[in-house]
């Protein structure tokens, strides 16, 4: 029996979500270009989801699409549609519409709190080389060796690096803002928690190459030394 020329499979990808708070294409273009200039290797031609929940229903989505594309981003889906008018506008603009699960109604009866799920931890005991990408889906990630520039660590949970960190670390990739990044020798190109990120030049000079912990406080990255 001949093999089918195509095969559809489910998969998981880490995508950034761009929340638009302005419907003027020129303003969006300038803001995105500034972001790309800050981290060209990370953001140029990056696939993104566009959230339009803050935009008016009559926003020109075609013009916004052109602005986002011109800035070097590639739209893989639109989210945040508040009503049918916005959904029709997305479809009319020939943009992919992502379906979002409906929130479950709260039961009148108080259910017993579920036991917290035990997270598995992915452990990497070898050096992570430039160009390598490691993703710990649904778990924490521990690296016990060095991470080279150009390497990328991604985890839905926390990230621990027990070695020299020169690459990129993205914790809380599924949106968990309580995730942390721990590093014994911090010289990262980029650190991100739940989509909020710092480039390497944002790391305080007194902590460069030192042991540090990064977390989110009021939706902003903060850093403190590890004693």
Curated annotation (Swiss-Prot):
The lineage of its organism: Bacteria, Pseudomonadati, Pseudomonadota, Gammaproteobacteria, Enterobacterales. It comes from the Bacteria. Keywords: Cell cycle, Cell division, Septation. This is Probable septum site-determining protein MinC. InterPro entries: CAP/MinC_C, MinC, MinC_C_sf, MinC_N, Septum_form_inhib_MinC_C. Interacts with MinD and FtsZ. GO terms for biological process: cell morphogenesis; division septum assembly; regulation of cell division; regulation of cell septum assembly. Cell division inhibitor that blocks the formation of polar Z ring septums. Rapidly oscillates between the poles of the cell to destabilize FtsZ filaments that have formed before they mature into polar Z rings. Prevents FtsZ polymerization.
């Amino acid at each position: 029996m001949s093999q089918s020329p195509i095969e559809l499979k489910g998969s998981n990808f880490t995508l950034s979500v761009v929340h638009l708070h302005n419907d003027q294409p020129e303003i969006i273009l300038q803001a995105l270009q500034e972001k790309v200039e800050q981290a060209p290797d990370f953001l140029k031609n990056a696939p993104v989801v566009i959230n339009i929940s803050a935009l008016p229903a009559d926003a020109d989505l075609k013009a916004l699409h052109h602005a986002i594309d011109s800035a070097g981003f590639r739209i893989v889906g639109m989210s945040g549609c508040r009503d049918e008018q916005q959904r029709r506008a997305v479809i009319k603009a020939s943009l992919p519409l992502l379906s979002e699960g409906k929130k479950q109604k709260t039961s009148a009866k108080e259910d017993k709190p579920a036991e917290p799920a035990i997270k598995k931890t992915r452990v990497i005991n070898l050096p992570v080389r430039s160009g390598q990408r490691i993703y710990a889906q649904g778990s924490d990630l521990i690296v016990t060796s060095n991470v080279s520039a150009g390497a990328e660590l991604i985890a839905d949970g926390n990230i621990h690096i027990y070695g020299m960190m020169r690459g990129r670390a993205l914790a809380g990739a599924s949106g968990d803002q309580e995730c942390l990044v721990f590093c014994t020798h911090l010289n990262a190109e980029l650190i991100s928690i739940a989509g909020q990120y710092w480039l390497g030049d944002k790391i305080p000079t007194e902590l460069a190459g030192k042991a540090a912990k990064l977390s989110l406080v009021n939706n902003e990255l903060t850093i403190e030394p590890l004693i």
